[in-house]
Regions:
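Conserved, structured core segments of small domains
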Residues: 1-102
């Protein structure tokens, strides 16, 4: 199953986001587990400051997807004011392949 996740940061969490970013990236890019990241990145406010997270990933089921998100260092640091996990049903193929950037 495909999932999308949107996490909106609590106000004043930019310092926490920057301090936790490396471990967050390692967690979401871990291809050894049952979850496979397709794409993702920080959401930005009008001024360009990071203020949230977007992830699109594949997981066997909703429970596994939720466990993956609960183990994310961003979540464990208490960074999010809100979190939304939704199943995603692909209706149209993407015109280009999504690739993971470093």
């Amino acid at each position: 199953m495909y999932f999308i996740f949107i996490g909106k940061d609590k106000p004043g969490m930019l310092k926490t986001r920057k301090a936790t970013r490396a471990t967050h990236r390692k967690h979401v890019r871990n291809s050894d587990g049952p979850v496979r990241l397709m794409t993702g990145g920080p959401l930005a406010g009008k001024g360009g400051e990071m203020n949230g997270t977007f992830l699109m990933f594949e997981a066997p089921d909703h429970e596994t997807a939720q466990e993956f998100l609960d183990a994310d260092p961003y979540h464990q640091a208490g960074m999010f004011a809100s979190r939304e996990l939704r199943a995603f049903h692909e209706a149209a193929e993407l015109p280009v392949a999504l690739t993971q950037s470093n």
